[in-house]
């Protein structure tokens, strides 16, 4: 089977290595627009339960990923000087770039061909592939070009948010509820490697409109939020990485596939950052897709409907959360 993956995120990488591992005769190519060893964002989160599901799929990547983890069991919520702690959850975080490097290294070892710095705006040159995996993210042109076929439904949520990092090492999933003269703010924070954390800040559109931050620079954002969170940050600081204010896009699709094209990861669905499940969903998509293909002996007419049947209930449940 000839497989082409458009986009080299966790969904495409994990699917490709699992597919090549179980079907070494398949020709699998991944095309990614970003340079090697470059990504947006900071960290990703997994639960202990999620990792058990990946252990059986490929132990080598499971071991490399879990060896890179920082672990925590608690959720801490701060509001008006009060702290509420909930324990016993079992979470782990790691650097997003490290995850991509682990998956890519394993995929290449197994024989997957990966090309970076490849910008694709049409799948026409790849129509000779038996299977095209659309894993090219939230703004996927593949999904947009076939909106009606996929039943694509993209809704931008009203709140504004910005994705930052911090040098502060959080020992729990931490949520801050702060208020200033402009309105209410929510901070979503977790450590992903020693001395480095994700720090997402969210507010209503009404609050944001009062700040004067519309169209601001990253430096303006850091200055404003460093003042807002000066007590929480202490001697630590905020870090940027394409940290622009935006509205969260909720992506759903009624149909997960069209002929020999299948959607995965953020192209197929998004999960709100407050529950930290986007990467989990993407990698679970990969496991479900290769399992369905192997069960069907590579027959897409059987495998792709089975893939949707497996994934849709879980995806819908997480999006409702």
Region locations from a protein language model:
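Short, glycine/acidic-enriched loop or turn micro-motifs at the edges of active sites
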Residues: 35, 139, 269
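Glycine-rich FAD cofactor-binding loop and adjacent beta-loop-alpha segment at the N-terminus
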Residues: 2-72, 78-79, 88-98, 278
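Short glycine-/acidic-enriched loop or helix-start segments at secondary-structure transitions
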Residues: 15, 40, 124-125, 142-145, ...
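Short, well-ordered alpha-helices that flank and scaffold nucleotide-derived cofactor binding pockets
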Residues: 17-21, 105, 144-147, 291, ...
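Conserved FAD-binding catalytic core of PHBH/FMO-like flavoproteins
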Residues: 128-248, 252-253
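Hydrophobic "anchor" residues on beta-strands that sit immediately upstream
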Residues: 3, 28, 113, 130-132, ...
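Conserved mid-domain beta->alpha element of the FAD-binding
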Residues: 5-18, 133, 244-321
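Conserved N-terminal helical subregion
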Residues: 48-163
């Amino acid at each position: 089977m000839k497989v082409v993956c458009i986009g080299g995120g966790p969904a495409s990488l994990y699917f490709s290595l699992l597919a090549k591992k179980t079907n070494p005769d398949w020709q699998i190519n991944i095309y990614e627009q970003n340079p090697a060893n470059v990504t947006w964002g900071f960290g990703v989160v997994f639960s202990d339960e999620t990792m058990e599901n990946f252990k059986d799929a490929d132990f080598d990547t499971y071991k490399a990923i879990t060896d890179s983890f920082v672990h925590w069991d608690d959720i801490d919520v701060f509001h008006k000087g009060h702290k509420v702690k909930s324990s016993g959850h079992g979470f782990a975080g790691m650097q997003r770039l490290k995850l991509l490097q682990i998956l890519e290294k394993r995929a290449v070892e197994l024989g997957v061909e990966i090309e970076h710095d490849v910008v694709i705006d049409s799948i026409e040159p790849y129509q000779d592939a038996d299977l095209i995996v659309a894993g090219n993210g939230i703004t996927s042109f593949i999904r947009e070009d076939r909106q009606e076929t996929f039943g694509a439904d993209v809704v931008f949520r009203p709140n504004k948010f910005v994705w930052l990092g911090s040098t502060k090492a959080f020992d729990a999933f931490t949520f801050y509820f702060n208020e200033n003269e402009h309105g209410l703010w929510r901070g979503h924070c977790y450590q992903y490697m020693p001395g480095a954390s994700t720090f997402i800040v969210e507010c209503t559109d009404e609050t944001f409109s009062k700040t004067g931050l519309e169209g601001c620079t990253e430096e303006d954002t850091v200055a404003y939020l460093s003042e807002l969170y000066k007590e929480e940050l202490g001697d630590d600081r905020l870090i940027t990485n394409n940290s622009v204010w935006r509205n969260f896009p909720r992506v759903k699709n009624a149909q997960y596939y069209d002929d020999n094209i299948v959607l995965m990861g953020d192209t197929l669905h998004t999960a709100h950052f407050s529950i930290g499940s986007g990467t989990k969903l993407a990698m679970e998509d990969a496991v479900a897709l290769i399992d369905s293909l192997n069960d069907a002996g590579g027959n897409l007419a059987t495998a792709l409907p089975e893939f949707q049947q497996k994934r849709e209930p879980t995806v819908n449940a997480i999006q409702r959360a």
